[in-house]
């Protein structure tokens, strides 16, 4: 059982959101249960970028503070040259196979996240299984269950 979980932007955004909506609380409690079960939860730099840019745009200072807290509390995975080179390979592979995951001129965060997950031999917790599962093990975050 893979116990390394990389958070995609969607669950990371829910966990860092200070609004105690039922969905946000469910996601936060899910993360806590995985941690208590011995999972390593990783905040990938590319997911931090996706969440952070929107929080900055919207002036959500409480969300930024929570995101910073998560970044400093959980394991943070910075981007590296090796990861970016692998992401470029994945991007080209997807295009050549007719399965692009983003516009040709867009920064494709999914392939960058997939490259980070491959480097860590981890599973991606997401709400966007389709694109990510082309490259790496990805599951809806609700389907990654703690082990006893």
List the model feature ranges, each with a label.
Residues 40, 73-75, 137:
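Conserved beta-strand segments of alpha/beta enzyme cores
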Residues 24-31, 67-70, 101-115:
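Glycine-rich, flexible loop segments associated with nucleotide phosphate handling
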Residues 11, 47, 83, 113, ...:
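Alpha-helix capping/helix-boundary segments
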Residues 2-4, 33, 114-148:
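Acidic, PIN/NYN-like endoribonuclease modules and their adjacent C-terminal/linker elements
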Residues 1-43, 53-69:
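Short, well-structured N-terminal submotif of metal-dependent ribonuclease cores
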Residues 14-15, 49-53, 132-135:
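Short catalytic/ligand-binding loop motif for oxyanion handling, primarily in non-cytosolic enzymes
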Residues 75-123:
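Active-site neighborhoods of divalent-metal-dependent phosphate/nucleic-acid chemistry enzymes
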């Amino acid at each position: 059982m893979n116990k390394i979980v990389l958070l995609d932007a969607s669950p990371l955004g829910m966990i860092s959101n200070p609004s105690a909506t039922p969905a946000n609380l469910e996601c936060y409690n899910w993360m806590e249960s995985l941690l208590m079960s011995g999972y390593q939860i990783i905040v990938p730099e590319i997911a931090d970028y996706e969440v952070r840019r929107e929080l900055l745009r919207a002036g959500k200072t409480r969300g930024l503070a929570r995101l910073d807290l998560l970044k400093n509390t959980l394991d943070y995975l910075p981007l590296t040259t090796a990861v970016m080179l692998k992401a470029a390979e994945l991007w080209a592979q997807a295009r050549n196979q007719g399965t692009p995951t983003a516009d040709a001129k867009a920064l494709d965060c999914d392939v960058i996240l997939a490259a980070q997950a491959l480097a860590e031999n981890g599973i991606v917790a997401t709400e966007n299984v389709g694109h990510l599962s082309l490259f790496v093990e990805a599951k809806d975050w609700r389907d990654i269950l703690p082990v006893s």
